[in-house]
């Protein structure tokens, strides 16, 4: 049998096919999307979705879809502040993002107060969540409310607000969270009062949080908080949890967005 000699046209076609195959393997949108994950990042008291911008940009650059909902009555939704806002309102805010966006395989992250929020969200949409992350956050048990777990100064401030029927708890300075000096003015300009009665709502938990496959606790070690230290030490002994300590103030997403993004990708 005589072997056919390659023609110039065949050579060009072969080169084109090879380049196309390389492009498909190296930069296929379908391939990139196969590993993309939805991240839902939930802020804590006095904050808003704005505080996640640096982390969201880093995760987005890696091809992930990122949602940073602002809870009712805070941030750009501060005009909705009222005495009717409870913890359940905030749980609904986040659960509805997951429901209405039809999200699955969610990495759900809650900062500080939002440890209550994401624990409640797990009760409503647990099958949609594959990884839950508590970022320097409360880890509540059934029947607890935020007021039960707050440090003495914040406990007193909340009771004073309730006594005066104030719908919003006063804003502390960013310095109180040990935010780095460069970002303190920016954070101060964004903080808004925290809905008072959200701190009084007991949470109802039936164990949905514990059914989530991946569970992580991240402690900001430069922010003194004995309760959070206790969570970390307890969870270090639990093989169902991954734990991290980062040398940051309370607002890790502001102070150390690069390191936080790395951890979130590790535990996704």
Name what the model sees in each region:
Residues 221-247, 254:
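Conserved loop-alpha-helix segment in the C-terminal half of the alpha/beta-hydrolase fold
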Residues 73-106, 123-124, 148-150:
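Active-site loop/oxyanion-hole signature of alpha/beta-hydrolase fold enzymes
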């Amino acid at each position: 049998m005589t072997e056919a000699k390659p023609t110039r046209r065949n050579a060009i076609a072969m080169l084109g096919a090879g380049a196309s195959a390389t492009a498909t393997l190296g930069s296929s949108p379908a391939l990139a999307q196969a590993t993309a994950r939805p991240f839902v990042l939930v802020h804590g008291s006095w904050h808003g979705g704005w505080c996640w911008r640096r982390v969201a940009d880093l995760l987005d650059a890696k091809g992930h879809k990122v949602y940073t909902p602002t809870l009712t009555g805070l941030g750009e939704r501060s005009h909705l502040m009222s005495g009717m806002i409870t913890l359940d309102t905030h749980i609904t805010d986040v659960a509805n993002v997951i429901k209405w966006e039809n999200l699955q395989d969610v990495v759900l992250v809650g900062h500080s107060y939002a440890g209550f929020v994401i624990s409640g969200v797990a009760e409503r949409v647990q099958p949609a969540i594959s990884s839950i992350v508590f970022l320097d956050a409360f880890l509540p048990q059934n029947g607890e409310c935020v007021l039960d777990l707050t440090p003495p100064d914040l406990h007193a401030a909340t009771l004073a607000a309730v006594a005066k029927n104030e719908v919003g708890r006063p804003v502390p300075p960013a310095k109180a969270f040990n935010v780095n000096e460069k970002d303190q003015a920016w954070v101060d300009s964004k903080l808004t009062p925290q809905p008072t009665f959200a701190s009084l709502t007991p949470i109802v938990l039936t164990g949905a949080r514990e059914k989530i496959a991946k569970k992580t606790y991240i402690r900001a070690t430069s922010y003194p908080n004995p309760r959070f230290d206790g969570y970390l030490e307890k969870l270090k002994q639990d093989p169902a949890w991954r734990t991290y300590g980062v040398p940051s103030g309370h607002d890790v997403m502001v102070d150390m967005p690069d390191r936080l993004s790395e951890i979130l990708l590790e535990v996704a």
